[in-house]
């Protein structure tokens, strides 16, 4: 039959005897001795019953064309298709596998069939992934098989192993050991009778058993949940493992407990601890990992065994919540921030997610640098703000460290702030700088000699405090090229436009502290380091900048400037703002370019601008960097406001 063309079976008519009738058996006539192609189609044979002819046999249906004919070959169907078309699809949704076994077996033979290993395997496989059936909907065969007390204990106390009757194979629906549930924790199926912590079959071990670790059910499968270490009451409900933060891929020392509970609720954080643990995670926040606004999964509660346990370092990484552990003064920050915004933590190890939400309503501090990237900072920081980096509630503490380091796209040196140890070094190295012209990607050691002292963007809290004093804006960390990422004492906007001009159309994002005697800071950065001279007025600063810009060959290099080929003051200011060409060195030397990134070898001149008619140099000539100066003066005047709002909206 394997070579059957279409549905016609190749039958030799020498098969004597009565036909198989209409069932598709292919009746073959005994009268004719010639080989003929008899049809096995039930429609062809349906009229020829066994008694339909006087000879008692069916007349064979003779095809006019042999099977090798092209017309018949064209009508053939593959055997796989035939099997799919004629197969009974009931085995896919077989009711016996989807519903529990009947409580009373119909016959002993059927009961034996149900107890066969294949049937048990099929039933076990059919229950994979299904939620735990409630005790009422479970099999009632326990009661009929003498396990009535066990069934009652299963419903009342939740003790699934208290089978008092003899365990029979028909208890397979009730006995949880045999139905494989890959999503339930191994320890959570055996609930203590007094427990009832979380719902369903998972999660909440006994309330009195403080040693059982309970995992939070994270609604999304992107990250493994944190499992609170509830052994000591000092650790908060989102306490991380003692090493600091588990990587967002799960694993770590407590990876064995990271199996997800079958509770589907994102809010149900089943506390497995005795009531001493301060549960600082709000109900809408179903995971212990705090996803800060920068997508930086910093578990902010360092589980220090001997120190003041659970002290919440309020490390708001660029504008979301720190989990309040109940003992630190930053307790109000966590309640309303993340419950409405991000559902799942945005992993810093997986790029491509927009991470910055709008500033939440529950922002706690009035001048909160936590919202430095999430929204706009206040115009002036309040006076008397504690700049002590050791207090968790202070502005600069871990917040400024995280906001400064996070906004500048770099991590902090180890041990320099409370954040050290609470986050892996690569957590804050995502490209968090929203400035499209920023070259300091991934903490490139930007300045040739200047940045060596304070490893690229990593800021000390003292430098951050000095930055606040000098009016350093955290929405746009520095001027467009970020020449002074490592020098926080340099001001916000570029050299030509001081940060005090908050309403300046070119730099709308600068803000300053009031009562600063010398608010205008020279931002010029050369290979020798930043200038950082302070001036009282912008005119003095501009005249000082002319000393930086007067170097030989400027007219020649500025010939590509769109407006003028002479060294106008605007061109000088533009070069002062954007190019930071030092006074010494050949025009194309690496020290001159002061480029802040190793993978921008050609610097700004490699960026194509369609409207700049910069003459290309001769092949041996150095790269004419200021030829690209002109095109980079206008975009900030045109798009400065738009870039600012886009950065607040998480535009990358």
Curated annotation (Swiss-Prot):
Zinc-finger keyword on record: yes
InterPro entries cross-referenced by the UniProt entry: Elbow/Noc_ZnFinger, Tscrpt_rep_NocA-like, Znf_C2H2_type
- Record's compositionally biased regions (Polar residues): 1-11, 221-230
Residues modified as N6-acetyllysine are 213
Question: Which parts of the sequence carry Omega-N-methylarginine?
Answer: 642
Q: Name one GO biological process term.
A: negative regulation of gene expression
What segments bear the compositional bias annotation Low complexity? Answer: 135-144, 231-244, 314-336
Its predominant location is: nucleus
- Identify the GO cellular component terms for this protein: nucleus
Give start-end positions of Basic and acidic residues composition bias.
254-263
Give the Gly residues compositional bias ranges: 16-32, 145-157, 194-209, 264-283
What would be one Pfam family of this protein? nlz1
Q: Where are the zinc fingers (C2H2-type)?
A: 520-548
Any GO molecular function: zinc ion binding
Record keywords: Acetylation, Metal-binding, Methylation, Nucleus, Phosphoprotein, Repressor, Transcription, Transcription regulation, Zinc, Zinc-finger
Q: Give the Phosphoserine positions (modified residues).
A: 107, 235, 241
Enumerate the subcellular locations listed in this protein's record, separating them with semicolons: Nucleus
The source's superkingdom equals Eukaryota
| Family of the protein in this entry | Belongs to the Elbow/Noc family.
Q: What does this protein do?
A: May function as a transcriptional repressor.
Q: What is this protein called in UniProt?
A: Zinc finger protein 503
The gene for this chain is Znf503
């Amino acid at each position: 039959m394997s070579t059957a063309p279409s549905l016609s079976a190749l039958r030799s008519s020498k098969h004597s005897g009565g036909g198989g009738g209409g069932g598709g058996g292919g009746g073959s006539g005994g009268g004719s001795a010639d080989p003929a192609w008899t049809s096995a189609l039930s429609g062809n044979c349906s009229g020829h019953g066994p008694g339909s002819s006087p000879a008692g046999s069916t007349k064979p249906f003779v095809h006019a064309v042999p099977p090798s004919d092209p017309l018949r070959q064209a009508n053939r169907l593959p055997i796989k298709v035939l099997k799919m078309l004629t197969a009974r699809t009931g085995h896919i949704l077989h009711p016996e596998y989807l519903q529990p076994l009947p409580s009373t077996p119909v016959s002993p033979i059927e009961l034996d069939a149900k107890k066969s290993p294949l049937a048990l395997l099929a039933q076990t496989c059919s229950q994979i992934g299904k939620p735990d059936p409630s005790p009422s909907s479970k099999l009632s065969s326990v009661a009929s098989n003498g396990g009535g007390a066990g069934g009652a204990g299963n419903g009342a106390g939740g003790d699934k192993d208290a089978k008092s009757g003899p365990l029979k194979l028909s208890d397979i629906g009730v006995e949880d050991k045999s139905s494989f549930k890959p999503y339930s924790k191994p320890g959570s199926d055996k609930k203590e009778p007094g427990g009832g912590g979380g719902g369903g079959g998972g999660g909440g071990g006994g309330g009195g058993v403080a040693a059982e670790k309970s995992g939070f059910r994270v609604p999304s499968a992107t990250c493994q949940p944190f499992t609170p270490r509830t052994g000591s009451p000092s650790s908060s409900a989102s306490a991380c493992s003692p090493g600091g933060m588990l990587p967002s891929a799960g694993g770590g020392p407590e990876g064995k407990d990271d199996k997800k509970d079958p509770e589907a609720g994102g809010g149900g954080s089943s506390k497995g601890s005795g009531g001493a643990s301060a549960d600082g995670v709000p109900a809408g926040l179903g995971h212990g990992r705090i996803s800060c606004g920068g997508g930086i999964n910093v578990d902010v509660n360092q589980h220090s065994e001997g120190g003041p346990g659970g002290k919440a370092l309020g490390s708001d990484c660029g504008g979301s919540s720190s989990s309040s552990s109940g003992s630190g003064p930053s307790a109000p920050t966590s309640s309303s921030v993340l419950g409405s915004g991000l559902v799942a933590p945005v992993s810093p190890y997986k790029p491509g997610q927009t991470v910055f939400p709008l500033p939440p309503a529950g922002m706690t501090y009035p001048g909160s640098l936590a919202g430095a990237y999430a929204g706009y900072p206040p115009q002036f920081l309040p006076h008397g703000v504690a700049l002590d980096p050791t207090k968790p509630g202070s502005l600069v503490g871990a917040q400024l460290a995280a906001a400064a380091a996070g906004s500048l796209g770099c991590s902090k040196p180890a041990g320099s702030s409370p954040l050290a140890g609470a986050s892996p070094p690569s957590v804050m190295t995502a490209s968090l700088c929203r400035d499209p012209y920023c070259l300091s990607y991934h903490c490139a050691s930007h300045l040739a000699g200047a940045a060596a002292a304070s490893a690229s963007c990593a800021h000390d809290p003292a430098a951050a405090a000095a930055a606040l004093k000098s009016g350093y804006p955290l929405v746009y960390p520095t001027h467009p090229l970020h020449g002074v990422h490592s020098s926080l004492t340099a001001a916000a906007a570029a050299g030509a436009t001081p940060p005090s001009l908050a309403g300046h159309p070119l730099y709308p994002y600068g803000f300053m502290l009031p009562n600063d005697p010398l608010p205008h800071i020279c931002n010029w950065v050369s290979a020798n380091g930043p200038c950082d001279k302070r001036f009282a007025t912008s005119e003095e600063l501009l005249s000082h900048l002319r000393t930086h810009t007067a170097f030989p060959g400027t007219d020649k290099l500025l010939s590509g400037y769109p407006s003028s080929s002479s060294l106008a003051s605007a061109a000088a200011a533009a070069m002062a703002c954007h190019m930071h060409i030092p006074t010494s060195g050949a025009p194309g030397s690496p020290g001159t370019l002061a480029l802040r990134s190793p993978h921008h070898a050609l610097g700004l001149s490699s960026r194509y601008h369609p409207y700049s008619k910069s003459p290309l140099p001769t092949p041996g000539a150095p790269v004419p960097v200021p030829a690209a100066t002109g095109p980079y003066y206008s975009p900030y005047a045109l798009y400065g406001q738009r870039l600012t709002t886009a950065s607040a909206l998480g535009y990358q």
